[in-house]
């Protein structure tokens, strides 16, 4: 198992944003590992941007009429398993992955930050297949 395996939930403390925003602790969901150390991933957020007209249930929320999609993780619902620590993982708050916030990241940048102790990377678990 590698940290950047598809479906892995990681935690950076802190995460350094490409746009220069203040670094802060952040979860990181690996969606796909591509060639040349590129990772397709999302930075889940606790900010709820689901329109009030859409029912909020754990799972994929998609409304093509208004071009809205996200995955909603209900707080404290076990969503992943950490094989190393033999424990389940759940987000402590309602958490959202929005389609428009999926990005490409260069894994080599993370490797350098970890090697120089600029950040601590913690493996939280691998998503359950649902």
Stretches with model-predicted labels:
Residues 21-24, 30-77:
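Compact nucleic-acid interaction/catalytic patches
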Residues 63-130:
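C-terminal terminal-subdomain/extension
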Residues 6-7:
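Loop/turn positions that initiate beta-strands
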Residues 15-19:
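Short, charged beta-turn/beta-strand-edge "cap" motif at the junction between a beta-strand
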């Amino acid at each position: 198992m590698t940290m950047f395996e598809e479906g892995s939930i990681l935690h950076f403390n802190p995460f350094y944003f490409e746009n220069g925003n203040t670094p802060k602790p952040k979860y990181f969901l690996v969606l796909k590992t591509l060639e040349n150390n590129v990772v397709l991933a999302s930075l889940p957020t606790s900010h709820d941007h689901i329109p009030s007209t859409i029912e909020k249930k754990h799972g994929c929320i998609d409304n093509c009429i208004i071009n809205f999609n996200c995955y909603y993780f209900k707080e404290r619902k076990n969503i992943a398993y950490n094989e190393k620590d033999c424990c389940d993982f759940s987000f402590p708050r309602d958490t959202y992955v929005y389609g428009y916030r999926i990005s490409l990241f260069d894994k080599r940048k993370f490797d350098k930050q970890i090697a120089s102790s600029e950040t601590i990377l913690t493996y939280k678990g691998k998503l359950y297949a649902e």
